[in-house]
């Protein structure tokens, strides 16, 4: 075999072997060589969007998954590692508009290219289970389950104020609005009333909350979901009024309902605020154009609580009053831009003395501030300059200035207030959730068609919204549409749009809204288990699910992970599956970072420069003092921007394909595993990549130099080992023990460190007549090194394993047994201690491993450095540090 490390030839040969033998194709209920059923292990990365090319975040994610899958398979597990494509969504439509091609063509072309990139990475993917969510064979089951959910009332249609993205021309779920802007377009979100379909995820709020307890997920992710679900215990009650509508009927039966977690502050209410869409606001605006204009202004912007919390609080008095239920005082009603109609009853009570938002609102509009709770054992006098002291805490406050509730603790007051209001028939204790139902209707083309047919029109209601019969599924999306940016192209496709009503047979129209793409990603991992199933899932799903290990970015903590958990529980309730949670364990890999550089124009406009185009000026210690563009003679100033996440916007990404072409996939894999633990951020380093390449070259050159002797050696160890062989095996098996521990902890960076230590131990050994190490012992040690390295660098190790003759006895490296630590090899008969005289190192001392303190002292005192220093005299003191050193004080 060649001693030159040719990564292209090596990786091509390995991949050809894997393709020819289809080694990554797995089946259910696999057995080992002895006929015993293997334990299953399902390890899966979050499926990618086929954007065109892989980025380094993909490389890191999939390499982590691959390392895990390969090592577990060698340990005897039946491992499933599938891959698919989250193929619907707006980017494909935008690309289609820009390139004047159908989104389908753009998507499938990207899938083909990215699949080649994954093959080049050497990933152990079972491609027989590949899924693309834009395939009718897949999304028909989105439609089928939608109809089942419709039957059960889990899916329903309603008109509601929603987040509207004016650029993408579609509704956004709350989770898809970030800082008041659309998560894809970045446009400022508007409020609109629009009909659409919703999933009743709020009915599962308590299950979604309690189910987190048993999951092996990062606490940070659990906390994010807990906060998003937002369980609150409080009191829902009503302020009475006699405000009538145009027909003379009291609006909402004369009751303005609010919910509060701080019913102990009810006596401090000085105003109520309602949402712009509230019936009382509409009534007040009928003859008040100024208020009407303010209401319209409020209807622009996000309907996200987090966004409302940071925007300036604005309001306008309606001229209306409601009656306080306990004091009978008149309470003014205001329209507030911070009140959501979709949250609770669309109204809140205002207690300025004990709520930061209400306090700011009251100061701005000169509303009364009434203190009604006080800190225990302190002066109850409210001071407006120290309002923070009176904000709502629960543990150390009592009611004050609250009549019959004076002196009651928070909990006592809440229960008493709730009881009084319940007796009056206008209040009750209630548990609420911040979580809102999931709106799935999107006014876009490239998505799963919602299987509904609309019969009738405004003049003739007809049959209304009629579900598509199950036999007519899937409702196939025409793939030849080329969007032009002027709305949903499905509205222009008569062949899709026009259909007969399934109930009455009269002309009708298909629903042209498509489903939120998070529907697609809510169950794809189950379809992997049986992509050819004639039902949504089959028995294979019960074998593989729930998933043992899920891997993906923490940015999906709320959106995808919450929806997937909800979807799983719905499928359980429909008796399609028997498990409650989809993902038993979750690993959230850290981001990949790189340096950023930019040039800045006089106007302040920044042009981001790729790090490969920048040359650094370094001082004598290698620290950057400045930067310049390579080959730039004009002296354009280059500013060092610091280390940030790799992104297109900062132009600081590294092309994985270029990296593989130059160094090989094994080098790329080794670097991303060695540079940082999986959960931590990884800072890109060109020097680190070079170092990874040098290490692999050393492995190849050393192994190939010893290959001929090792290939002919026996697998069985000699019956008697010499001291050098014992010491070599002790070192190698000690390193193996640490590597096994690190593999178990998923600390792959220290696994690579262990392999490097092992190579350092082996490299000095050159088999030959003068070598104290036999070929059989080195054969064992090298087999351990190759197996420890294999999950991380599968190409090089696969070829070496084969060329050095290991496969003849152990079979393919993928299915070779994981090396077992020989505990007897770790037993030392002799250890080496540092010998010090008067605290200065004077040599080494070999002593029996089980020697007592007295025996060690005796051996040390007989050593040449000791006898010379003592010159026949006795030592003043002898200090023994077990396992490390002995110090003789002369």
Curated annotation (Swiss-Prot):
Query: What keywords is this UniProt entry annotated with?
Result: Aminoacyl-tRNA synthetase, ATP-binding, Cytoplasm, Ligase, Nucleotide-binding, Protein biosynthesis
Q: Where is this motif: 'KMSKS' region?
A: 645-649
Note the InterPro entries from the entry: aa-tRNA-synth_I_CS, aa-tRNA-synth_Ia, Leu-tRNA-ligase, Leu_tRNA-synth_edit, M/V/L/I-tRNA-synth_anticd-bd, Methionyl/Leucyl_tRNA_Synth, Rossmann-like_a/b/a_fold, tRNAsynth_Ia_anticodon-bd
Q: What class of enzyme is it?
A: ligase
This chain belongs to the protein called Leucine--tRNA ligase
Query: Where does this polypeptide localize?
Result: Cytoplasm
Query: Which Gene Ontology molecular-function terms are recorded?
Result: aminoacyl-tRNA deacylase activity; ATP binding; leucine-tRNA ligase activity
Q: What is its EC number?
A: 6.1.1.4
Q: Which domain of life is it from?
A: Bacteria
* Chief location of this protein within or outside the cell: cytoplasm
PROSITE patterns linked to this entry: AA_TRNA_LIGASE_I
């Amino acid at each position: 075999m060649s001693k030159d490390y040719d990564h292209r030839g090596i990786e091509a040969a390995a991949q050809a072997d894997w393709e020819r033998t289809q080694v990554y194709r797995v089946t259910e209920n696999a057995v080992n060589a002895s006929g015993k059923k293997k334990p299953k292990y399902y390890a899966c990365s979050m499926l990618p969007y086929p954007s065109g090319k892989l980025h380094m975040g993909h490389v890191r994610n999939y390499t982590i998954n691959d390392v895990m899958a390969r090592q577990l398979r060698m340990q005897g597990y039946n491992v499933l590692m599938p891959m698919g494509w989250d193929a619907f969504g707006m980017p494909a439509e935008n690309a289609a508009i820009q390139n004047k091609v159908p989104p389908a063509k753009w998507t499938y072309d990207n899938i083909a290219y990215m699949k080649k990139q994954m093959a080049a990475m050497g990933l152990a993917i079972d491609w027989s289970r590949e899924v693309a969510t834009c395939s009718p064979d897949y999304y028909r089951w989105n439609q089928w389950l939608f109809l089942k959910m419709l039957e059960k009332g889990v899916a329903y249609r309603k008109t509601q104020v929603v987040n509207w993205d004016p650029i993408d021309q579609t509704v956004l779920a709350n989770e898809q609005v970030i800082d008041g802007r659309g998560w894809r377009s970045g446009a400022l979100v508007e409020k609109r009333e629009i009909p659409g379909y919703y999933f009743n995820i709020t009915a599962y709020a308590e299950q979604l909350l309690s189910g987190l307890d048993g999951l092996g997920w990062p606490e940070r992710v659990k906390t994010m979901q807990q906060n998003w679900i937002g369980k609150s215990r409080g009191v829902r009650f009503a302020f009475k009024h006699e405000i009538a509508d145009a027909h003379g009927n009291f609006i909402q039966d004369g009751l303005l309902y609010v919910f509060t977690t701080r019913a102990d502050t009810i006596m401090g209410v000085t105003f109520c605020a309602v949402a712009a869409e509230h019936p009382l606001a509409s009534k007040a605006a009928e003859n008040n154009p100024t208020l009407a204009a303010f209401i319209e202004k409020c209807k622009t912007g996000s309907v996200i609580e987090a966004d409302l919390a940071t925007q300036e609080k604005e309001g306008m008095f309606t001229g209306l009053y409601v009656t306080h239920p306990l004091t009978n005082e008149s309470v003014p009603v205001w329209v507030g831009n911070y009140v959501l109609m979709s949250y609770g009853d669309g109204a809140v009570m205002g207690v300025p003395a004990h709520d930061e938002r209400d306090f700011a609102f009251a100061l701005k509009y000169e509303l009364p501030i009434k203190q009604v709770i006080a800190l225990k054992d302190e002066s109850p006098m409210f001071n407006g300059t120290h309002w923070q002291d009176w904000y709502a805490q629960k543990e150390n406050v009592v009611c004050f200035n609250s009549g019959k509730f004076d002196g009651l603790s928070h909990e006592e007051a809440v229960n008493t207030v709730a009881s009084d209001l319940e007796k009056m028939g206008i209040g009750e204790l209630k548990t609420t959730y911040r979580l809102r139902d999931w709106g799935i209707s999107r006014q876009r083309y490239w998505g799963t068609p919602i299987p509904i047919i609309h019969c009738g029109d405004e003049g003739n209601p007809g049959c209304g919204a009629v579900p598509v019969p199950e036999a007519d599924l899937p409702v196939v999306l025409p793939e030849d549409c080329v969007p032009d940016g002027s709305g949903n192209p499905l509205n222009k496709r008569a062949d899709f749009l026009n259909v007969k009503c399934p109930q009455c047979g009269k002309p009708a129209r298909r629903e042209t809204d498509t489903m939120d793409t998070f529907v697609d990603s809510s169950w794809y991992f189950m379809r992997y288990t049986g992509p050819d199933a004639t039902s949504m899932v089959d028995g294979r799903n019960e074998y593989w699910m729930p998933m043992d290990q899920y891997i993906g970015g923490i940015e999906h903590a709320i959106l995808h992970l919450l929806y997937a958990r909800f979807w799983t529980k719905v499928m359980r309730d429909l008796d399609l599956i028997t498990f409650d949670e989809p993902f038993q364990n979750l690993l959230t890999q850290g981001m990949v970072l790189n340096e950023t550089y930019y040039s800045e124009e006089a106007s302040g406009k920044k042009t981001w420069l790729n790090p490969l185009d920048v040359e650094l000026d370094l001082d004598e210690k290698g620290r950057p003092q400045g930067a310049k563009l390579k080959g730039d003679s004009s002296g354009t100033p280059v500013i060092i921007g610091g280390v940030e996440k790799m992104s297109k916007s900062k132009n600081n990404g590294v092309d994985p394909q270029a990296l593989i072409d130059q160094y090989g996939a094994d080098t790329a894999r080794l670097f991303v595993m060695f540079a940082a633990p999986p959960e931590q951020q990884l800072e890109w380093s060109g020097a680190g990549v070079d170092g990874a390449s040098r290490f692999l070259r050393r492995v190849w050159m050393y192994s190939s130099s010893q290959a001929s002797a090792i290939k002919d050696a026996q697998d069985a160890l000699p019956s008697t080992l010499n001291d050098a062989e014992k010491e070599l095996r002790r070192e190698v098996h000690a390193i193996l023990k640490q590597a096994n521990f690190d593999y178990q902890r998923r600390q792959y960076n220290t696994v690579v460190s262990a392999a490097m230590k092992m190579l350092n131990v082996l490299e000095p050994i050159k088999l030959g007549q003068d070598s104290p190490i036999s070929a059989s012992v080195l054969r064992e040690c090298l087999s351990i090194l190759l197996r420890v390295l294999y999950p991380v660098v599968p190409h090089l190790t696969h070829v070496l394993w084969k060329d050095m003759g290991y496969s003849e006895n152990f079979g393919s490296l993928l299915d070779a047994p994981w090396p077992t630590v020989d505990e007897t090899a770790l037993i030392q008969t002799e250890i080496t201690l540092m010998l010090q005289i008067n605290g200065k190192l004077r040599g080494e001392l070999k002593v029996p491993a089980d020697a007592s303190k007295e025996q060690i002292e005796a051996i040390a005192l007989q050593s040449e450095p000791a006898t010379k220093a003592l010159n026949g005299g006795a030592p003043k003191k002898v200090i023994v540090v077990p396992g490390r050193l002995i110090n003789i004080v002369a």
